Regions:
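N-terminal secretory signal peptides that target proteins for export/translocation
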Residues: 1-18
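Bacterial N-terminal signal peptides
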Residues: 21-34
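Boundary at the C-terminal end of the N-terminal hydrophobic targeting segment
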Residues: 37-39
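Mature N-terminal segment immediately following signal peptide/propeptide cleavage
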Residues: 44-74, 78
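Buried hydrophobic core positions in alpha-solenoid tandem helical repeats
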Residues: 45-50, 79-84, 113-118, 146-148, ...
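Structural detector for internal amphipathic alpha-helices that build alpha-solenoid repeat scaffolds
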Residues: 60-72, 93-106, 116, 126-140, ...
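Short, charge-rich amphipathic alpha-helical segments embedded
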Residues: 72-92
Length: 195
């Protein structure tokens, strides 16, 4: 049969043959646009909150931004915690309140991402402490395993628990040599006078 005698496919037939490709592209476009629409408000909210200043400067805008930020999912917790890096104390309070609100609402926290955030010692010490507390609330056994590794942490707040744990080990040691070793280790790492 000659090629010119084949029936010409109708536009509908062509569209039906391309349906999987069309649906895939449509789904990709939807997911991409949705991701952008969620990421943009979070970035804008973080920027607005970080701009809050003394004497109420930016507080009204920060309150609106906080409402938007507090609706974020738990997967955004590391991003919000990272925004505490270099933030002034007022902005850090707004960010901490958003983290607390999200953590209280969400049933499952991104423990692995929080642990990665905690391990990065370049982050704000209070943000890292908050990440640790979130980990402790989600997985107390994991948090207990992390404490000994904080004995030389640059964050005094995180180091304190590790030092306290070593002091306790020295107190319960039955052998004086072990107790002295534990106390020396604790004294080398302690940064607070009361320890």
């Amino acid at each position: 049969m000659p090629n010119n005698l084949l029936p010409t496919p109708t536009p509908l037939a062509t569209l039906l043959r391309m349906r999987p490709l069309f649906l895939g592209l449509l789904g990709f476009a939807f997911l991409t646009s949705t991701g952008i629409s969620f990421a943009a408000p979070i970035a804008n909210s973080l920027k607005t909150i970080r701009a809050v200043g003394a004497e109420g400067k930016g507080n009204a805008a920060a309150a609106k931004a906080w409402q938007s930020l507090a609706k974020a999912g738990a997967d955004q917790l590391p991003v919000i915690l990272a925004a505490m890096d270099g933030a002034n104390p007022l902005a850090a309070n707004w960010l901490r309140a958003a983290v607390d609100t999200i953590a209280a609402r969400e049933k499952k926290l991104p423990v692995a991402a929080l642990q990665k955030f905690l391990a990065d010692k370049s982050h704000n010490p209070r943000a890292r402490r908050l990440a640790f507390e979130l980990i402790r609330g989600a997985d107390a056994k994991l948090a207990a395993k992390l404490i000994p590794g904080m004995i030389n942490d640059p964050s005094v707040e995180l180091r304190r628990e590790a030092v306290a744990q070593v002091l306790d080990a020295g107190k319960i040691a039955n052998q004086p040599a072990i107790a002295v070793k534990e106390y020396r280790k604790a004294l080398d790492a302690a940064r607070d006078i009361d320890q």
